[in-house]
Amino acid sequence: MLDDRSAIEHHKYSQRLTELERRSAAAQQRQQKKKPPKMHVGNKIRGIKIKRYVSNGERVLKLVVLFSAILLFMLYIISPLSKITTLHVTGNHDLTKEQVEKNANIYPGRFIWGVYLARHQLTKQAIRKNPQIKDLRIKVTGPQSLQISVKENALLGIAVMNNDTYAVLADGQLQRTKNADNGIAYKRFDGHKKVLATTAAQLGKLKLAIRNGISSVSYQPTKEYPDRVIIYMRDGNTVYGDLNTIGDKMGYYPAIAASMKNKGIIDLQVGAYSYDYGSKDK
């Protein structure tokens, strides 16, 4: 009887043990499905080596491309392909293209990047050589083409002093010249260079339309008006003015001239008024 009972209990224990083993195996299978299989250490090392190799290869390629580009650019700089073949000059009115090129020392055949890198020095050099050049802008417009934009000190006219002929510029500078150009004729300024420079700087403020209407300017001081200049207009009128203020007051000339019925004198020395020739002795 005892043997039968012991056999039954042993059988039940074996069944429970089998059931537990089955559940444990099933749980392990589920967990293995959730987690990816572990990579072998050797495979990991191989993968790291491959990544490093690819990364190093990319770095080397980038360096090769960079140094190749630098080398090609350096070869281009010293090759005939970087020499100026086309040169454009813009903004010049009184100056010729050749004068601008000569004063700036820029010409076809020079290395374009050498010119560009030295553009500030070349600009200063041009201004120093020729007062008619107020400013320069140098711009690379192509592999072999360059543009020079010039800003001029306008040429107002010519003055003859002590047998020397001077070009009178809009900023008041005087430039000795051999060419008697058209423009405003400056008279009776002998021995008065500073007065001429001040007068020129004042007239340089005027709009081009007014300035082009001036035929000549004469320095004629009096006791009452020691800074008097007389301006003879191309339309037949005469303007009396102060050489220190004439640049501002001449701005009223078009309106005053339009209101006059006859040709006459416009006095801008003190205030602003006009009268016909012969109607008032001044």
Swiss-Prot record:
<dbReference type="GO" id="GO:0032153">
    <property type="term" value="C:cell division site"/>
</dbReference>
<dbReference type="InterPro" id="IPR026580">
    <property type="entry name" value="DivIB"/>
</dbReference>
<feature type="region of interest" description="Disordered">
    <location>
        <begin position="19"/>
        <end position="41"/>
    </location>
</feature>
<keyword id="KW-0812">Transmembrane</keyword>
<dbReference type="InterPro" id="IPR050487">
    <property type="entry name" value="FtsQ_DivIB"/>
</dbReference>
<keyword id="KW-1133">Transmembrane helix</keyword>
<feature type="topological domain" description="Extracellular">
    <location>
        <begin position="81"/>
        <end position="282"/>
    </location>
</feature>
<keyword id="KW-1003">Cell membrane</keyword>
<dbReference type="InterPro" id="IPR013685">
    <property type="entry name" value="POTRA_FtsQ_type"/>
</dbReference>
<feature type="topological domain" description="Cytoplasmic">
    <location>
        <begin position="1"/>
        <end position="59"/>
    </location>
</feature>
<comment type="similarity">
    <text>Belongs to the FtsQ/DivIB family. DivIB subfamily.</text>
</comment>
<comment type="function">
    <text>Cell division protein that may be involved in stabilizing or promoting the assembly of the division complex.</text>
</comment>
<dbReference type="GO" id="GO:0043093">
    <property type="term" value="P:FtsZ-dependent cytokinesis"/>
</dbReference>
<keyword id="KW-0132">Cell division</keyword>
<protein>
    <recommendedName>
        <fullName>Cell division protein DivIB</fullName>
    </recommendedName>
</protein>
<keyword id="KW-0131">Cell cycle</keyword>
<keyword id="KW-0472">Membrane</keyword>
<feature type="transmembrane region" description="Helical">
    <location>
        <begin position="60"/>
        <end position="80"/>
    </location>
</feature>
<dbReference type="InterPro" id="IPR034746">
    <property type="entry name" value="POTRA"/>
</dbReference>
<dbReference type="GO" id="GO:0005886">
    <property type="term" value="C:plasma membrane"/>
</dbReference>
<dbReference type="Pfam" id="PF08478">
    <property type="entry name" value="POTRA_1"/>
</dbReference>
<feature type="compositionally biased region" description="Basic residues">
    <location>
        <begin position="31"/>
        <end position="41"/>
    </location>
</feature>
<feature type="domain" description="POTRA">
    <location>
        <begin position="82"/>
        <end position="153"/>
    </location>
</feature>
